[in-house]
Amino acid sequence: MGDGVSEERSPLCGKSATSCSERVRDRGTRADLECSLRGHSLKDIPVTSTSSPGSSKEEVLDSQSPGEADYCRRILVRDAKGTIREIVLPKGLDLDRPKRTRTSFTAEQLYRLELEFQRCQYVVGRERTELARQLNLSETQVKVWFQNRRTKQKKDQSRDSEKRSSSTSESFATCNILRLLEQGRLLSVPAPPNMISSQNNMGTSSGNGTSLGTSGSTSPVISTTPPGAGAFSLQVPSLAASSSPRLPTPFYFPGPLLGGLHEIPSGYGLGSSAFEPYTRLDRKDTASGKKSTS
């Protein structure tokens, strides 16, 4: 029965009767045969399409409208090896936006703006309009210049305050050191024991007591310069007079400068003195000095 149908409808096919019979043999169903014989459009017969893969890609790219694209611009770049690569710029990057130009002021304009800034740091209203007209500038340029100038002034003030604080801390430390020097806690060097014993002997023989005079306002030091050809006296200047009204204490270093200091008696309390290591010296000379005085 299928053969009869094919024979009746074969004139409709014309030259393609042989191809229709081949399709019937391949598919083996009547419905497929009827569908293949009904229409001869390009959609039903994709074999007759002559479009290449390259042309299909071009059609896909052309179908996309520039408004729907997710990129701003595509740039073809050829690298050193000769390979062409495509760089896709994001949509948020606006390359067509005009760049802002920097305003270059003349010397006369800067001089006038600086004068106005020294007079008033905030120029608004008619003053700004008049100043912009006189300097041949826009009000926006004048306003931005004043904003930048105020920012620069704040930075300079903060930098100056930091320098002042550092110098103040250094001067405070110097005053503390000088105060300790005046109080005799750093460089107070007592007289050698043989000199003290000679002064005591002279005081007892004359009956006037000891020759060491102490007052409530000064440190206990020798009032007269000790005899000797190599005696050296040092007086610390009072640079911290505003902080401490105490008078400077004279220090006496008997002997030559390069000869070194004499030993310090163990009974003299130095506390946190700079000469504390000298208290650990040998006490043989002190013992001999005591025997000579007795």
From Swiss-Prot:
Residues 98-157 bind DNA. Residues 1-27, 43-65, 149-168, 190-223, 272-294 are annotated as: Disordered. Transcription factor that may function in dorsoventral specification of the forebrain. Regulates the expression of Wnt signaling antagonists. It is found in: Nucleus. The keyword Transcription applies. It comes from Xenopus laevis (African clawed frog). It holds the Pfam family Homeodomain. Residues 1-10, 154-165, 279-288 have a biased composition (Basic and acidic residues). Its main location: nucleus. Belongs to the EMX homeobox family. GO terms for biological process: brain development; central nervous system development; neuron differentiation; regulation of transcription by RNA polymerase II; Wnt signaling pathway. This is Ventral anterior homeobox 2b. One of its GO terms (molecular function) is RNA polymerase II cis-regulatory region sequence-specific DNA binding. One of its GO terms (cellular component) is nucleus. Residues 197-219 have a biased composition (Low complexity). Keywords: Developmental protein, DNA-binding, Homeobox, Nucleus, Transcription, Transcription regulation, Wnt signaling pathway.
